[in-house]
UniProtKB/Swiss-Prot annotation:
PANTHER family: PROTEASE FAMILY C15 PYROGLUTAMYL-PEPTIDASE I-RELATED (PTHR23402), PYROGLUTAMYL-PEPTIDASE I (PTHR23402:SF1). This is Pyrrolidone-carboxylate peptidase. It is an enzyme of class 3 (hydrolase). The lineage of its organism: Bacteria, Bacillati, Bacillota, Clostridia, Peptostreptococcales. It catalyses: Release of an N-terminal pyroglutamyl group from a polypeptide, the second amino acid generally not being Pro. It is found in: Cytoplasm. It comes from Clostridioides difficile (strain 630).
Amino acid sequence: MKILLTGFDPFGGEPINPAQEAVERVNNNINGAEIIKITIPTVMTKSVEAIDKTIQEHNPDIVISVGQAGGRFDITPERVAINIDDFRIKDNEGNQVIDTIIKEDGEPAYFSKLPVKAMVKHMNENKIPASVSNTAGTFVCNHVMYGILYMIDKKYPNIRGGFIHIPYTTSQVIDKKNTPFMSLEEIVKGLELAIEACIIYKEDVKEIGGEIS
């Protein structure tokens, strides 16, 4: 089995991106699966193009993209991506699209092809805080998640794919009072556990994971 794991480069004025840092530190082999790791640019079109190129080169069974969501308390596998770009800030090439459809021939939304509740369960059972997220935002993270699932829908039907958001890491919150964070070591462990769950569970578990609002 091959698993493609991607992390973004720094964006939004941050000197590092814990997604990139954590992905680089994930084990190269997990439960017998080869982990292929790449850094993708925080740029709307080029990010998805880089993933597509790597899929064609390596033919992975699973694609997992990882991004930072500063302000979140835990690791959050994303349930759904929506067909809209609405950038609050510019991406790393100055693009700031507003209320723009990502793919005219795509679905209004795509649900993750990963066992998101099983991933959360496996992380929590191993003392890593995690929960299911029902919004990947409207920036490049959602764009990438939607792009992965669009490609699965249109040309890679045998691949499973999805997205995981992670919090700030320790060094990023020194000047951000009362901001949640997680150590890089915990993030790496969480990602490895999430990958394990994707290998173990072909279908998701039935457990409470919803939100009131």
